[in-house]
Swiss-Prot record:
Disulfide bonds: none
Gene: SC34
PROSITE patterns: RIBOSOMAL_L10E
Species annotation: Oryza sativa subsp. indica
Keywords from the named record: Ribonucleoprotein, Ribosomal protein
GO terms of molecular function: structural constituent of ribosome
Name of the protein described by the UniProt record: Large ribosomal subunit protein uL16z
GO cellular component: ribonucleoprotein complex; ribosome
GO biological process: translation
Keyword Ribonucleoprotein: yes
Family, per entry: Belongs to the universal ribosomal protein uL16 family.
Length: 224
């Protein structure tokens, strides 16, 4: 028996049903890799970021996520280069889908009970996606922004419903806008933390602070 089409499970109807000690025998999700490309590049390497945002409330199967990841990665590798981007899948398929198998052979009515006890057995997994939730993100240099947009446009065809491609104002995957990041970097108030960045505040033990560095200046505090 083949896999039931994902259009049968597109609408979010019931509560989340994750894998647990009560929900056993769940098949592994098709997507196993969520970060592709130069995932160890520092936060300063890729300042530009493009998002693929869902515009519907729906279920997205793990097969669709894997297909979109492959399509986006293939286009970016071919056109921008394998060292020129970092792709991240932002949703995870934790919701378990069930199927109540029905026999279609001769004499099936003697073997099955119809809709009596129709809870079903685990068939696959999907991600529960809301309106405005980011599905895929690509960080790269500004020169490759057009390639990232086209790669996400191709990945859109793997998903049901509507999606939008949004050019982010943030610096890479951080929470700071590009103007804020450049300003804080020049003031020495930001520290790189892998693909992210940490803002250095004025809290902490005063004994461990260098002379003259115990408190931030009034001008800096006012701007913060």
């Amino acid at each position: 028996m083949g896999r039931r089409p994902a259009r049968c499970y597109r609408q979010i109807k019931n509560k989340p049903y994750p894998k647990s000690r009560y929900c056993r025998g769940v098949p592994d999700p098709k997507i196993r890799i969520y970060d592709v490309g130069m995932k160890k590049k520092g936060v300063d390497e890729f300042p530009y970021c493009v998002h693929l945002v869902s515009w519907e409330k729906e279920n997205v199967s793990s097969e669709a996520l894997e297909a979109a990841r492959i399509a986006c990665n293939k286009y970016m590798t071919k056109n921008a280069g394998k060292d020129a981007f970092h792709l991240r899948v932002r949703v995870h398929p934790f919701h378990v889908l069930r199927i109540n198998k029905m026999l279609s052979c001769a004499g099936a009515d003697r073997l099955q009970t119809g809709m009596r006890g129709a809870f079903g057995k685990p068939q696959g997994t999907c991600a529960r996606v809301d309106i405005g939730q980011v599905l895929l993100s690509v960080r790269c240099k500004e020169s490759n922004a057009k390639h990232a947009e086209e790669a996400l446009r191709r990945a859109k065809f793997k998903f049901p419903g509507r999606q939008k491609i949004i050019h982010s104002r943030k610096w890479g995957f951080t929470k700071f806008t590009r103007e804020e990041y450049v300003k804080l970097k020049a003031e020495g108030r930001i520290m790189s933390d892998g693909v992210n960045a940490q803002l250095l505040g004025s809290h902490g033990r005063l004994a461990k602070r260098a002379p003259g560095k115990a408190f931030l200046a009034e001008t800096i505090q006012a701007s913060a």
